[in-house]
From Swiss-Prot:
It comes from African swine fever virus (isolate Pig/Kenya/KEN-50/1950). It comes from the Viruses. Interacts with host BECN1 (via BH3 homology domain); this interaction allows the virus to inhibit BECN1, and thus autophagy. Interacts with host BID. Interacts with host BAX. One of its GO terms (cellular component) is host cell mitochondrion. PROSITE patterns: BCL2_FAMILY, BH1, BH2. A motif (BH2) lies at residues 126-141. GO terms for molecular function: BH domain binding. This is Apoptosis regulator Bcl-2 homolog.
Amino acid sequence: MEGEELIYHNIINEILVGYIKYYMNDISEHELSPYQQQIKKILTYYDDCLNKQVTITFSLTSAQEIKTQFTEVVTELFKDLINWGRICGFIVFSARMAKYCKDANNHLESTVITTAYNFMKHNLLPWMISHGGQEEFLAFSLHSDIYSVIFNIKYFLSKFCNHMFLKSCVHLLRNCNLI
């Protein structure tokens, strides 16, 4: 890798791969870069909000199934718009899926990470670069408020709760009127 590709690789590792590894408990918070520690805050907040809204159960048994279903889900998420909030949802979703694979001991978490990495590289990174890159993502993370988080969680749930990939989406909070 050289030049521009190395820069892109570093951006994806900072934003996506670092958080997934932290989420799976493969690295500690102290091993995160200062930048990763900052974005971890908003991603953890997104995850907490999502966790309060719905329980997502995965059914993943093969690398091909992960690639196909992951791509279907995230393509649906971004089919009409890319924004920083949806990118946060994408990262949290990727981390949850990887952790599920690790916890299920099916040794497929690396497939999730590779699939998420490739999707971000080919589908999201050009938008991210043209919208300020890491600096703008961090600015979004630091200035995101509860309303934008809830809005993006609602959107995330509306896209995924009826998707065949998810076996169940239960425990919606009645007072949030999510979908």
